Amino acid sequence: MKKDWDPNDPKLKSPYAPHETAAVLRMHRVGFKGAHTMKLLKLRGTQLMNQIQRAMDAEQAAHRAGRPIHDAGVVKQ
């Protein structure tokens, strides 16, 4: 019998696990305007900028470590 997927599995915290790009960065790359992103995610401007900066730093660290980067698409409507 196949086990259900566990999002808290320790293997997902492995330093070799693929990096998943944060939603704020994916939204920015698809062309969402900052004001629209802030409204959808209920963030202030400084919060949004901090999250984008953290996402970029994490993605750069994953790239330097040679980890694959999973950058799922976001549909802009």
From Swiss-Prot:
It comes from the Viruses. This is Gene 68 protein. The lineage of its organism: Viruses, Duplodnaviria, Heunggongvirae, Uroviricota, Caudoviricetes.
